[in-house]
Amino acid sequence: MKGVGTEIGTIHFVGIGGIGMSGIAEVMHNMGYSVQGSDMAESYVVEGLRSRGIKVMIGQKAENVAGVAVVVTSTAVKRDNPEVVAALENRIPVVRRAEMLAELMRLKSTVAVAGTHGKTTTTSMVACLLDAGGIDPTVINGGIINSYGSNARLGDSDWMVVEADESDGSFLRLDGTLAVVTNIDPEHLDHYGSFERVKSAFVEFIENVPFYGAAMLCIDHPEVQAIIPKVRDRRVVTYGFSAQADVRGEGVTPIPGGNRFTAVLRQRDGSFRRIEGIELPMPGRHNVQNALAAVAVAVEMGVSDELIRGGFAKFGGVKRRFTKVGEVDIGSGAVTIIDDYGHHPVEIRAVLAAAREGVQGRVIAVVQPHRFTRLRDHMDEFQGAFNDADVVYAAPVYPAGEQPIEGVDSAAMVEGIKARGHRSAHLTTGADELAKELAATVQAGDMVVCLGAGDITKWAAGLADAIARERAGA
């Protein structure tokens, strides 16, 4: 923290295995702070923290916070959590995750990446290009960056790249020197109350940029474009495929595993310069759009065209963002298994469009809706999100702590998908049933795309082996 050394005592993270909490904990540990935490279950994140020397306790009990100096929580942690109760009883400061992240950001100049979708991938791309440019930023991301093997890293420079989560409004604490907004959709209305308040929060986020900074805004997205006139006294750099964009993508051409494109940069004197032949090893037009945001940041920070090209060529992607997790050899070819975090209709459409770009056979979507309230609020959009899938399997809703809502379930979603003209949409009850069904029906060249923010990732991880076993036993 600014003006304070690292000898402040132990900092305890409640729910340290959460992807947002773990990154802050890891960076603070690497900075020399004494860090520990607790979580409700073992996970690969917990295992990774322990391997880096951070003490993690399973189970949340009052005694876990004995003798600590500060307790850090996320908004998911309730005030009746036994560790929080014990901290308050003992007058131990309890701070939110965003407040701690904001303290870290005060130590450095920051690129803060916000938006309803695409934050994690865009944050990773920005970090990749700054690495390529020799800037060596500290990074705190909302997903595992494959080249780091972690979602966080302590860099040597005065720059930090962070994912700014808008879900609970806490991103307004994060004052970025450079701010990126990828898109704005009506999500997290339980917190904001209305979409108008969501949009107002993004305007405030942009206006928190200092006068010497800039905001990189995706002009292709209508809601982002609509807030540009409301930003009156901060410099705005637009990006996208629009002819009006300051950083424009053109000539997008599919290549194996990704896309090649040209970035056309509008200079301050009105002239243009082109960065041609950028190869992004990640499929999907939406990912080219994310890459343009990273180009805008990199150019602002003086990274050369050649280093931008080289940085993208080495981009290793993000865990659970169109990640290949398996392959099944079926004699005449192979079936590819993809794991993706997409759990909102906009994300699902983008992921399936990316799959359609490179698949030789069929696209088979396996979706696990995440939260009953999200499915209720976006049922129509979910039912229309699967046009690029030849076959759809819907798993039971992952509740994420919510209670069921009558009439809001995967069966209702599947009925709506079929009512809209889809010829092959089905329910599946579990990973074993899915493996049996796929073993009997997959064809060479098919791509199975598992979608969701719940435990569908575990299905994806074991699916290739399960299909192979079923086929061997047939």
Curated annotation (Swiss-Prot):
Q: What is this enzyme's class at the first EC digit?
A: ligase
Q: Which reaction does it catalyse?
A: UDP-N-acetyl-alpha-D-muramate + L-alanine + ATP = UDP-N-acetyl-alpha-D-muramoyl-L-alanine + ADP + phosphate + H(+)
Q: In which pathway does it act?
A: Cell wall biogenesis; peptidoglycan biosynthesis
What GO terms are given for molecular function?
ATP binding; UDP-N-acetylmuramate-L-alanine ligase activity
Q: What is its main location?
A: cytoplasm
Q: Which GO terms describe its cellular component?
A: cytoplasm
Q: Which InterPro entries match?
A: Mur-like_cat_sf, Mur_ligase_C, Mur_ligase_C_dom_sf, Mur_ligase_cen, Mur_ligase_N, MurCDEF_pg_biosynth, UDP-N-AcMur_Ala_ligase_MurC
E.C. designation(s): 6.3.2.8
Its annotated compartments are: Cytoplasm
A Pfam family it matches: Mur_ligase
Sequence positions that bind ATP: G115, T116, H117, G118, K119, T120, T121
Q: Which domain of life is it from?
A: Bacteria
* Gene3D superfamilies per the UniProt record, alphabetical: Mur ligase, C-terminal domain, Mur-like, catalytic domain, NAD(P)-binding Rossmann-like Domain
Q: Give the family this protein belongs to, as stated in its UniProt record.
A: Belongs to the MurCDEF family.
The molecule here is called UDP-N-acetylmuramate--L-alanine ligase
